Amino acid sequence: MMIARCSLFPPPCFSAVRIRCFAGETSDTGILFREKLIYLQDLNVDPHKALRVNPSLRSAPISSVVSVETLLSSTGLSRPAVGRILDMFPDLLTSDPESEILPVLRFLSNEISISEQDIPKSISRCPRLLISSVDYQLRPALTFLKTLGFVGRDTITSRNTVLLVSNVERTLIPKIEYLEEGLGFTREEVAKMVVRSPALLTYSVDNNLVPKVEFFIEEMRGDVKELKRFPQYFSFSLERKIKPRHRLLKEHGILMPLSEMLKVSDGQFNHWLLELRLRSAERR
């Protein structure tokens, strides 16, 4: 089982060689500090950024930093991936693997049933999981998401664990309320939408949902019921895809369901558009 591998018994490739390298036969703080900087650079972690964001790193023993890398690597993450995560979140460099990182890994494995093979995928896609409290963030978010229908075959997976780092009161509920009140959908209808398209819960209300709804209703003269059937509409760029394709269809007097209008590639869309224009010309 995954957690057995994460019990702070470092894999052979870490246990002897790397830690002994930095164990240091000197008490010279200057030398030890330089060794730490070299170690961070070897991980592709920016030492200056790390020290600025996490001042505690300056006095932390290098063995504690190595133990963090060891644990993360034992989940199956590659060393470059570990370095990228530690560079993004330097506070992890001085975290306690036993009390701060392992609880997150156990939560993913035991409470969400994410497989051992998918644990590194979850972490790579959403490194913020590692700095999130299980009790105050991850578990409350999971409980709320279950009420929306993220259970059974629709349960949270490694593809959408990013939802777990969203604050329920400040982030998730306002989006649900907008879809209910702004579009007139019931909670059940909204729940079906977000389960079909979980990314809906990651989009900004003001910067994504509102402008796309306004364009759909005011410019496209669309029926909001179509948004229920195709919630993926919100995942497409308004400026780069929705507006240009709508403009082309409007210019040629062609009506097309949202899913057909947006899901195909640019090449396929242009091919369809040409075919529709030719058929229209033949009918004349």
From Swiss-Prot:
User: Which GO CC terms are listed, alphabetically?
Assistant: chloroplast
Query: What does the UniProt keyword field contain?
Result: Chloroplast, Plastid, Transcription, Transcription regulation, Transcription termination, Transit peptide
One Pfam family of this chain: mTERF
> What name does the UniProt record give this protein?
Transcription termination factor MTEF1, chloroplastic
Q: What does this protein do?
A: Transcription termination factor required for plastid-specific rRNA accumulation and protein synthesis in plastids. Essential for embryogenesis.
One GO MF annotation is:
double-stranded DNA binding
Localization, per the record, is: Plastid, Chloroplast
What are the recorded Gene Ontology BP terms?
cellular response to singlet oxygen; chloroplast organization; DNA-templated transcription termination; embryo development ending in seed dormancy; regulation of DNA-templated transcription
Would the keyword Transcription regulation be found if you checked this record's keyword annotation?
yes
What broad class describes the main subcellular location of this protein?
Answer: plastid
Encoded by which gene? MTERF1
Q: What is the consequence of disrupting this locus?
A: Albino seed and embryo defective when homozygous. Developmental arrest of the embryo from globular to mature stages.
| Signal peptide per UniProt | none
Q: Where is the transit peptide?
A: 1-22
The entry's family comment says: Belongs to the mTERF family.
Q: Which organism is it from?
A: Arabidopsis thaliana
- Asked if the Swiss-Prot or TrEMBL record annotates the protein with the keyword Plastid, the reply is yes
Query: What InterPro entries does the entry give?
Result: MTERF, MTERF_sf
Cite the PANTHER family for this sequence.
CGI-12 PROTEIN-RELATED (PTHR13068), TRANSCRIPTION TERMINATION FACTOR MTEF1, CHLOROPLASTIC (PTHR13068:SF36)
